[in-house]
Amino acid sequence: MKDFLRLELPVLPLRNTVVLPHTTTGVDVGRLKSKRAVEEALSADRLLFLVTQKDPEVDDPAPEDLYAVGTLAVVKQAMRLPDGTLQVMVEARSRARLLSYVAAPYLRAVGEAIPEPPLKDPELARVLVNEVQEAFERYLQNHKTLRLDRYQQEAVKSTRDPAILADLVAHHATWTLEEKQTILETPEVEERLKRVLALLLRDLERFELDKKIAARVKEQMDQNQREYYLREQMKAIQKELGGGEDFLTEIEELRERIEKKGMPEPVKEKALKELKRLERMQPGSPEATVSRTYLDWLLEVPWTEADPEVLDISVTKRVLDEDHYGLKEVKERILEYLAVRQLTQGKEVKGHAPILCFVGPPGVGKTSLGKSIARSMNRRFHRISLGGVRDEAEIRGHRRTYIGALPGKIIQGMKQVGVVNPVFLLDEIDKLSSDWRGDPAAALLEVLDPEQNHTFTDHYLDVPYDLSKVFFITTANTLSTIPRPLLDRMEVIEIPGYTLHEKRAIARYFRWPFQVKEAGLEGRLEITDRAIERIVQEYTREAGVRNLDRELSKVARKAAKDYLEKPWEGVRVVDAEDLEAYLGVPKYRPDRAEKEPQVGAAQGLAWTPYGGTLLTIEAVAVPGTGKVNLTGNLGEVMKESAHAALTYLRAHREEWGLPEGFHKDYDLHIHVPEGATPKDGPSAGITIATALASALTGRPVRMDIAMTGEITLRGRVLPIGGVKEKLLAAHQAGIHRVILPKENAAELKEVPEEILKDLEIHFVEEVGEVLKLLLLPPPPPPAVQPDRPQPGVGA
């Protein structure tokens, strides 16, 4: 071969192959320019450059579409086929680097041959030659499609030239164009051998992995065939025994349902495992019944089924307003949640459905509000009553080892609704109890914790179940009996008692039309606002509207009976004066405060789970030895408030003109009427102090002012709870002036405007301010004075 330096030769672009030096290759040439290049080479010294295209899809490659390194080759033979294609045999002599292209009707370039460099490390090259030959032999043994004839294999085995070996192996191996081009572009022989060896070892690892996978697949196929064979045998045996065909059909149906159910993979595996156990049992055995029941539960509980949600907050607002009057805070919270869902719809946003806890007196609409939320969101609704539940298994279910075991109320509810995204109402969560069987409140921690409930595990199912899409709502009358860890999982929304105005609106626009329709008197019966107001004040005493609804129902039923006995024309209107004919004698007298000042009595305000109420506190001081008697079914906190008030008065005796030594010379009796009703809490502190000061000084107390506030030994007035309920009670009782702790001022925004405009609120920080407002000058002294100071007598 003559010494190649720089040559100007035709260029033959190659689409799907890389020709390496020291090899002879056949190339089909079909493109017009490529044919011209071959013909030009044949007409000259038969030399040309073979260069691979970067993109095989390019039909008319430009210089920039070709790699810079190719092969200098000699055309050994060319034959034209009937379709015009040239079949060319080329012998690759050496690597070549193309330097520049020359303008011509075909691709033509100036390039230079790249001679093989001398070996840098002959010993390393020798070792690499042996390793490459050994690896290539194993490569041929394991390759599924590559087959070399005896002469080709011998050429690889016998060569000791490292450069030739690297090119021959790369030529025969089924590597990508990019990998072969990398070998072509590697000038150093040792580096070239290393790359060839690395590619061979990579492929050998792949072959081993393929073998393992194939063996595993074959083993699985053999196992499936074996199971199929045994199953067919079992069918035949059962058929001979009689009665087995139905059982095997049932097994196949269960298997098909499991495959189609869309369970999570671990659940599916457990179901199939249980099905295999069932298959080996006698159809009528008790164990088979247990397995069937378990599989039925797994198949009937929803895993992926979901209702499409309505995420239009205008629709939701309309539905909530249709069903409930007022409850602004609750509705606002639901609309906030839906607004976020609407804005993030279709996005992967990590978030959880809120877990709301509605707290309020009976009859304010907590349960019905849950139904409205479900209706407004187009979700299915399920209610679970927790009142009196004392067994943990009611929540988590029983383990299958027990006879008659079933899942808990949560999983039963999910089966009932049939979707993974219902609204669940856990009613009366404050009335849970516990005993030796466990604490259901502790079991609810997992249900109501957004970080845990996506893997809730019922003891019966014994597989993780995702509750994260369930919208949980709980209801309670009071927070005091809910365990703190459970309460921490919930967003508490207080639903206070309704005002007289709200009750009148609810009765007028919601409950009365419903009761008239139920009685079949639409268009024949009406009721006045005065009648509704009288029912609220004299026939019911509640924070909600349940009894009001019951009384309205009585009126409608009584009118229906009257209509059947003696039909009337037009519309009958029920007025306040007619109520005794429909409802009988009033059950309550309106809660009215005393107007005249009293000695030894003070008007307090209290809050109960059923709403606010007036709390009159009486105090009497009689000659004695300093005993303090507290009556009226008082709790420990209220008794401590009484002692704190008494200590404050002792410390400020001179300021308020109290008898000297009264704590030793007089017995004090503090009483709170309605002794059958338990009372507790610190908010009666200033009321007790006022009643005691009045009893000890004989100064009357203004009874047209009600008060509430906790007292300290220093005479400070601390904030209290239930402000809205207490102000509603004062307003309903006809009191227009109320004393509140100054720190409660911010809570007035929760009180309806129509109530506030009728009230004069006095905010106080010290007990002294209270006593100055309430204590009037003492009455004229009696004609005959006793031997020692005599305090006023309590009312």
Swiss-Prot record:
Superkingdom to which the source organism belongs: Bacteria
Lon N-terminal domain mapped to chain residues: 9-204
Compartments it resides in: Cytoplasm
Keyword Transmembrane part of the UniProt annotation: no
SMART domains associated with the record: AAA, LON
PANTHER family (alphabetical): ATP DEPENDENT LON PROTEASE FAMILY MEMBER
HAMAP family: lon_bact (MF_01973)
Function of the molecule: ATP-dependent serine protease that mediates the selective degradation of mutant and abnormal proteins as well as certain short-lived regulatory proteins. Required for cellular homeostasis and for survival from DNA damage and developmental changes induced by stress. Degrades polypeptides processively to yield small peptide fragments that are 5 to 10 amino acids long. Binds to DNA in a double-stranded, site-specific manner.
Protein name: Lon protease 1
